């Protein structure tokens, strides 16, 4: 796999892998710099005669360490050190007996492939977008904040793996690339539509959804056949399944293709957002994102309904009055398809989530995981940039502005939750 060019000494994708490794192992050492100008290093032994050393730009008490690449392979019997790229770094670490354990060769090879692919995917998105400085320069709205997570999980060896998406599918469907796309629509015999909706009955909820997102298709929505929105990739996947093909053959399901408003994938990839719809929607997506296939379960969508009903109780309302700035995006509806035997197929499930920003899509919004991610260029994170803007706006020292930000976060988020 060809390595992509990137800023000298900075590799946030490799950083995720290494920080996960250091969190889960204990035989590494922190070596202080040999002079005031020299960087500290992580010393990671491979054997009695070899080790990897990685210079540190920052050693974090919370384990969010920042490295200065390349890493070096060193031998115990001489002073020579050899610069190594990320692919070789991974191979050397996975060959270590205590890491390899009793894992079969094919398991290790699959893991190594996912790590390398995730590394490449991360840099493909960063280099395609070229907008990190723009993201960092100003407050973000919901759409921008949800698509600002370019690095991924800070403690995962392959945070940007996405099997079986190919390159074209990844660019169309993943938030890393800031895409938008229309939904795909099925017209389904209502006997094969399962679901619930709290404020509106399910038929009315789906009708409103279609009217706001694909009004040109409303002629297909009748008393007996309902329009059901689908993630385009998942729709194609479902149409390959025997149970879905049976519905098509029986005339109980018609594929109407893609139509209507363009939706954007949020940071979770399977949840989609459109400024013009009262609902967001979270789909089952039969794709291995990070390390798990993202399909919903009936148990999960019904749990969302229970929480939405809880939000209508006097106890919840009292909590809301006590913390008026706290709002929860309730998943107060769901839908899915039943096969010819009447069984709900979980691969077809979707949760309908109240769009609290329907009237105010440009409201400043923060996504904590995006705020806290390491900057691809090695500079300020989005959180550090937000604190600097606060410092400038209030004419406060940066340290005091940081305390103000954390206090506001505690007051608005942590206190209501805990």
Predicted segments, located by residue:
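Nucleotide/phosphate-binding site architecture used for ATP/NTP-dependent chemistry
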Residues: 1-415
């Amino acid at each position: 796999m060809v390595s992509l060019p990137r800023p000298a000494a900075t590799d946030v994708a490799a950083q995720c892998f290494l920080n996960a490794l250091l969190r889960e192992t204990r035989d590494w050492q922190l070596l202080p710099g040999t002079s005031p100008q020299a960087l500290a290093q992580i010393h990671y032994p491979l054997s009695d005669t070899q080790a990897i050393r990685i210079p540190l730009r920052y050693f974090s008490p919370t384990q969010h360490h920042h490295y200065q690449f390349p890493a070096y392979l060193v031998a115990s019997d001489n002073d020579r050190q050899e610069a190594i790229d990320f692919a070789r770094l991974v191979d050397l670490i996975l060959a270590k007996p205590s890491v390899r354990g009793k894992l079969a060769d094919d398991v290790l090879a699959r893991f190594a492939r996912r790590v390398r692919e995730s590394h490449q995917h991360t840099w493909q998105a960063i280099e395609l977008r070229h907008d990190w400085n723009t993201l960092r320069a100003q407050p973000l709205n919901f759409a921008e904040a949800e698509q600002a997570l370019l690095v991924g999980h800070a403690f995962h060896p392959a945070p940007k793996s996405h099997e079986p998406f190919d390159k074209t599918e990844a660019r169309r469907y993943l938030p890393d690339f800031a895409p938008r796309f229309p939904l795909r629509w099925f017209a389904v015999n209502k006997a094969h539509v399962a679901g619930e909706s709290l404020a509106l009955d399910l038929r009315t909820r789906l009708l409103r959804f279609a009217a706001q997102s694909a009004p040109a298709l409303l002629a297909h929505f009748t008393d007996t056949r309902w329009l059901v929105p689908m993630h385009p990739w998942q729709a194609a996947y479902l149409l390959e399944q025997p149970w879905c093909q049976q519905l098509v053959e029986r005339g109980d399901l018609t594929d109407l293709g893609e139509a209507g408003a363009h939706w954007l994938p949020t940071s979770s990839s399977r949840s989609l957002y459109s400024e013009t719809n009262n609902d967001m929607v979270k789909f089952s997506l039969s794709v291995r994102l990070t390390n798990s296939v993202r399909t919903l379960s009936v148990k999960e969508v019904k749990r969302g309904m229970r929480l939405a009903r809880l939000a209508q109780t006097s106890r919840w309302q009292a909590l809301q009055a006590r913390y008026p700035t706290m709002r929860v995006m309730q998943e107060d509806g769901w839908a899915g398809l039943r096969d010819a035997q009447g069984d709900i197929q979980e691969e077809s499930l979707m949760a309908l989530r109240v769009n609290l920003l329907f009237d105010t899509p440009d409201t400043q919004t923060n996504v904590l995981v995006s705020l806290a991610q390491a900057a691809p260029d090695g500079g300020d994170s989005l959180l550090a940039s937000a604190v600097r803007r606060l410092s400038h706006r209030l004419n406060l020292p940066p340290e005091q502005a940081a305390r103000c930000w954390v206090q506001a976060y505690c007051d608005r988020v942590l206190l209501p939750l805990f």
